[in-house]
């Protein structure tokens, strides 16, 4: 029989302070005062100090020379999310343009095999499965640019949505990613016959889907 591991005081502080940031109780620019948090959480200052350091490492908090630890403007709302998806869409279309102009051979088999893997996962109800596959699709396409800068931005985009997206953004991303997966076969077929204009239009459709899902 497995025993449940006891949560440390630092992890309790981390979880509770993070919750306050994500629900807006602690807003961007607010100072994190150890004494105040200690009283609110009924925990000594030492684990609170450690938790603040952990939150800083995760991007929720930054240190100011004059004000100490303050809440960063890290939470991704709907408007910021749409801006990020537009940028990602531009990168993906740039990859298609490069495949077209440089006459690069598209690895159809790799994407087809991945699509088969996705189909085998359809019984899973958790929408994050599809979000992870959408990330794979974007990363795979961006490899044709042969530029780690684009890959890093794409990687950060998907990771930041998971970590910093507000509740509305997470739902939009998950629902829109299902539409992306539904269109992968269309993308493969278009690439196979060198119909690059259709591929570009499909990317536009995928980006637009994020907006349409939000206002459904």
Where are these regions (language model features)?
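Short linear motifs at protein or domain termini
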Residues: 1-93, 97, 101
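Short, Lys/Arg-enriched, disordered terminal segments
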Residues: 1-12, 196, 208, 212-216
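Short helix-capping and inter-helix turn/linker motifs at the boundaries of alpha-helical repeat units
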Residues: 8, 175-178
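Regular secondary-structure segments
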Residues: 18, 22, 96-100, 112-123, ...
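Contiguous, function-dense segments enriched for cysteine-driven chemistry
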Residues: 40, 56, 78, 135, ...
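A ubiquitous short alpha-helical element
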Residues: 78-82, 99-103, 120-126, 166-175, ...
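Conserved amphipathic alpha-helical segments that form helical-bundle/coiled-coil interaction surfaces
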Residues: 105-169, 180-184, 198-211
């Amino acid at each position: 029989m497995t025993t449940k591991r006891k949560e440390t005081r630092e992890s309790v502080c981390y979880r509770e302070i993070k919750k306050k940031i994500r629900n807006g109780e602690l807003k961007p620019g607010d100072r994190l005062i150890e004494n105040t948090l200690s009283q609110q959480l009924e925990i000594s200052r030492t684990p609170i100090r450690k938790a603040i350091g952990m939150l800083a490492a995760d991007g929720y908090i930054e240190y100011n020379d004059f004000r100490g630890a303050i809440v960063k403007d890290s939470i991704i709302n709907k408007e910021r999310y749409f801006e990020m998806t537009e940028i990602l869409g531009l990168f993906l279309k740039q990859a298609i343009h490069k495949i077209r102009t440089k006459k690069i051979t598209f690895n159809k088999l790799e994407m087809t095999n991945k699509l088969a893997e996705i189909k085998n996962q359809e019984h899973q109800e958790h929408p994050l499965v599809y979000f992870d596959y959408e990330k794979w699709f974007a990363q795979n396409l961006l490899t044709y640019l042969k530029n780690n800068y684009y890959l890093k931005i794409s990687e950060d985009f998907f990771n930041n949505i998971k970590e910093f997206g507000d509740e509305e953004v997470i739902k939009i991303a998950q629902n829109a990613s299902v539409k992306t997966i539904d269109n992968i076969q269309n993308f493969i077929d278009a690439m196979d016959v060198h119909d690059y204009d259709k591929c570009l239009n499909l990317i536009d459709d995928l980006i637009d889907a994020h907006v349409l899902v939000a206002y459904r």
